[in-house]
């Protein structure tokens, strides 16, 4: 895989996969990986095999798993299983050349004629990662049946979860 920054000619066709849900995704997590590192290893092995240049890490109302994938890539040089490196030096270089961006999936009303919610995908410039939580999620609200409004940032989602079940601790309420 060639480095994205070494383009010296006009248009170049590249493969992008902009909707990659991860282990621990907020809805319908059916991944069988033992842990997040194992999931990321499989993800990047497949991305290298398919020569994917851009990956959008997708989740509902969150960029937490995007941050975990970025952390995985940042620490990839130290990744070992049974004392052996998981990726070769060339694979590590190629993985670090894959452009990874946050893709926030939103579900909204009204529903379609078939009763399904409308999905909207918001792709963000990774340079603005730190402001997504407060500026973006803090400006979106969910109106509960009671009329109570909840911001769709982490604290607002926890409050919403606890309004559904007051016995939940923060992390469980966030996932609810």
Task: Place the predicted regions along the sequence by residue.
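An N-terminally biased module of ancient metal coordination in phosphate/nucleic-acid-related enzymes
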Residues: 1-115
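Extended substrate/RNA-proximal surfaces in nucleic-acid metabolism proteins
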Residues: 2-6, 71-176
